[in-house]
């Protein structure tokens, strides 16, 4: 979920539809040298790097210090594409209105795009009927998806109504290429050979020596990246979601933690056109595993749909302000106070 309409997080495609990965020779224009210790280590381990852009999707007039989405320049079926880097979405998504551009044929399904947010039929005028009418997702297979020098072939994707970008790069494909995402100095590092435990151990040692705190991630049953957290001592879990601008917690946790929540005019938009108004509150102690953030401004949302378990989200704003480095392949996140 995000504060702009976001693609579904609940697409489930068969794991048998595996992708093959190869390394292309030409150096793309967006592959840039990185002189940091992180870049040096990963280059020694055979990684490539693609810089990421930070963009205000749907709100070009937003203040400069507002959180921004991470965008990667990629190629879909040899056609240039802009994809949102979204660790909160397992399956890579392609926007339904870009199918002709990429020569992709959608296979319709009877599976609804679902969201824990309440129905947003009254928001139809705000975002446009065409977006909210698309409540079913389709599936397709890309011939190729290229990022930097890394080419993934035969890529299963979901098809959904996605505004502003050509699609969403999901965490499953990031895992396939052993991706390491630097949120504060936006870059995506990739290993065409895939994730390796020895590289993750070297990365852990280097980052901890530089003052980072390791936060173990767990892969949930629906392939989301989850970490332990607590709100003023109240334990919970949160999804690491670079596709969400805000860090959002279920309202009942805020009540239990004694948070004073203020109403806002901001609407959180979820998949399938669902929406909910958010409240904000100042949390004295927001702990992400062993990493503690003091006086954090958190958004609280009332998740009314009991068919889906509450999904608290650790959004890109909090990730950037705490210098997050996400080792998707190694299932670890590293945080350091900015």
Regions found by a protein language model. Give the residues of each.
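Pepsin/retropepsin-fold aspartyl endopeptidases
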Residues: 1-338
């Amino acid at each position: 979920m995000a504060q702009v309409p976001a693609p579904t997080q609940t697409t489930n495609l068969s794991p048998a539809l595996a992708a093959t990965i190869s390394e292309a020779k030409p150096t793309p224009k967006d592959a840039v040298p990185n002189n940091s210790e992180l870049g040096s280590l990963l280059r020694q381990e055979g990684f490539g790097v693609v810089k990421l852009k930070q963009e205000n999707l749907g709100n070009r007039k937003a203040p400069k210090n507002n959180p921004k989405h991470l965008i990667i320049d990629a190629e879909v079926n040899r056609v240039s594409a802009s994809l949102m880097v979204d660790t909160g979405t397992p399956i890579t998504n392609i926007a339904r209105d870009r199918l002709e551009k990429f020569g992709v044929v959608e296979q319709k399904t009877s599976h609804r795009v679902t969201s824990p947010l309440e129905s947003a039929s009254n928001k139809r005028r705000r975002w446009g009927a065409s977006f909210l009418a698309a409540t079913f997702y389709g599936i397709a297979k890309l011939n190729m998806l290229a990022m930097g020098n890394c080419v993934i072939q035969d890529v299963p994707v979901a098809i959904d109504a996605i505004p502003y970008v050509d699609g969403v790069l999901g965490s499953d494909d990031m895992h396939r290429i052993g991706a390491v995402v630097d949120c504060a100095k936006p870059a995506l590092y990739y290993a065409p050979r895939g994730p390796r435990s020895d590289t993750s151990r070297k990365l852990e040692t280097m980052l901890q020596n530089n003052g980072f705190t390791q936060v173990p991630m767990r892969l949930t049953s629906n392939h989301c990246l989850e970490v332990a957290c607590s709100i003023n001592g109240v334990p919970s879990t949160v999804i690491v979601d670079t596709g969400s601008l805000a860090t959002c917690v279920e309202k009942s946790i805020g009540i239990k933690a004694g948070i004073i929540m203020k109403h806002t005019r901001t609407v959180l938009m979820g998949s399938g056109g669902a929406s909910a108004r958010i409240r904000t509150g100042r949390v004295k102690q927001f702990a992400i595993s062993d990493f503690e953030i003091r006086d954090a401004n958190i958004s609280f949302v009332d998740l009314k749909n009991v068919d889906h378990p509450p999904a608290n989200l650790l959004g890109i704003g909090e990730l950037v302000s705490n210098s997050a480095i996400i080792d998707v392949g190694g299932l670890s996140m590293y945080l350091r106070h900015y």
